[in-house]
């Protein structure tokens, strides 16, 4: 069975503050430990060692490439720009709030 992913985004005042990419969590899954594979990224692991999600704590400095390096290392399919588009929003004044590259 393929893992289903979903993206949750926290924003305030027109700015994206954080994101969480969930990897097909099972009922009752909770984070038992974390790792920090790079700046602005935190991987959550279930008690059995499975990666269950990726916290994007600094979307303004994290790139799609950096996220995909972590996903591939976790044996997850790379994300597309469309999948993560809510993280990389352009505000009304033209200021980029995230960096897709």
Regions found by a protein language model. Give the residues of each.
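Intrinsically disordered terminal and processing segments
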Residues: 1-40, 46-47, 58-65, 73-101
